Amino acid sequence: MATLNHEGTISTFYGTVALRQAHAAAVSGDVITLSSGTFLSTDISKAVTIRGAGMDVTKVNDIVNEPTILSGNFNIKISAEDTGRLTLEGIYHNGNIIFSEGQVKNALFLKSRFKYISKSGSCKVQDLTVLNCRISESISVGSGNSAQLLNSVVNYFLDGYMSFSHCVILDSYYLFKDGNEYKSCIICRGGDFESGISSSSSAYNNLFISDKADLLQSVPNNTNLRVPTSDERFAYLRGYNDSKDYKLTDQNRDVLKATDGGEIGIYGGSLPYSAIPTNPQITKFNVASKTTADGKLSVDIEVKSGE
């Protein structure tokens, strides 16, 4: 089920095409809320908010019973004249998302699991924020465009000016990209083609799991730490899997502190990682099989607030 909120007026759509129908009826600024279940993806041409029930397909979260899954690739093509903000929250997507047309400004991807995010053509992507997300393959916003990633797990990244804070980056190959920023992250070895950090980038209080001795050659400060890939304390962090929580342990938590003196990685800082959506979730919905003697039907609903 999908509900569309347009200035307080609620419309409801059903079935796997519910998102497509809700988006077609929406205007910029509207809110589309999706229940748990699978929905066919739709190209997004309006700066709307799309909120799902959660991204957690592993069911380790006690609030999100079932995830909201979007099926199929989709494009984001929002006109430069659209001044609204696109927000995607609480969804699981295992296809390709392409910024393909127009200009996307200040978009927010929140508490979602994505596979592949990229840009094509002349589309401009300005100040994309990715918070409490998982990206199982890669993210790229294209040369000259920008994104900040906060408390998120990223398999690897490509083009664009990227700022990473309290992230886990699982493939460090593109560290050579110019102008990036890395703070309080855990950054793993980049396969057979590992590179050092660009001299035009900045890096503070990051843990690098790498055998490249000169990895930090261009970073003159002494706040970063490199440990070899043979260090068993961190072996479990390497490689992407939806079931991994990427938590530090009592054995390795104090090896390096973040810029704020707290924990590095996705559970540190002021926005620690959580898969729980911010919108309230229906966690129990029971309807009696028959009415009472006086014609009443018993309905038992339990709602837990989001974060």
Where are the regions that the model predicts?
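Acidic Gly/Asp/Thr-rich repetitive segments characteristic of extracellular carbohydrate-active
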Residues: 2-38
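C-terminal accessory segments
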Residues: 221-277, 281
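Right-handed parallel beta-helix/beta-spiral solenoid domain characteristic of secreted/periplasmic
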Residues: 48-100, 116
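Predominantly extracellular beta-rich ligand-binding scaffolds that present long acidic/polar faces
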Residues: 97-101, 116-244
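Surface beta-strand/loop "capping" patches
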Residues: 270-306
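Acidic glycine-/aspartate-rich tracts in secreted/extracellular proteins
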Residues: 36-38, 54-58, 208-215, 251-262
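Short loop/helix-cap segments at secondary-structure boundaries that form the rim of catalytic
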Residues: 40-47, 59-64, 198, 215-221
